[in-house]
Amino acid sequence: MNLIYKLVKSNSFLFKMVYYLRLLAFPLFIRLTWRINNTIENNALYSSIDKDIRGCNNYIKIGIKSRIYGLKIYVRGKNNKVIIGNNCVIGKKCSFWIEGDNNTIIVGDSCTFTHTVHLCAQEYGSSINLGEDCMLSNNIIIRTSDSHPIFNSDRERINEAKTVWIAKHVWIAPQTTVMKGVTIGEGAILASNSVITK
């Protein structure tokens, strides 16, 4: 090994070659190890899904007879889950966005999304849980985080991520935003252009 090292070091061409190969190989190694053991179970009747997943031990499951017409799944982190139930219909320009570790997005059986629905679970251990038979119209945002920290005068963070619970048979009208920590009861109807914070 020392002989090879001396040879490479004495020859400027070989030295540059090894140097540049290491620069290329290291990011490749990171990319390969950063995508270990991600599992996707797609049982959909029809699916058009764009997946951008970086991390390890992430799990995506799409239920039986679901129809997905234009969903982007973006994951950055590890041990995250996206579970779409059976008989769901997800329209075009929808996105599920996860950043952080141990986050979950669960869509119950027979849910329908019209189009442009954005579900965002961020930070650590937060989740979005939609019960069965929920109807989401267009331009809906549901999120578990503010996407940035806020600190008080004692430098303590005051806006941690919180789980969102939406019970079954909920209808969410257009242009509605559901913020972190919200619980919505069974059979509720959220009016157009609402911002739900509690």
Predicted feature descriptions by range:
Residues 48-52, 71-74:
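Short, recurring structural edge motifs at helix starts
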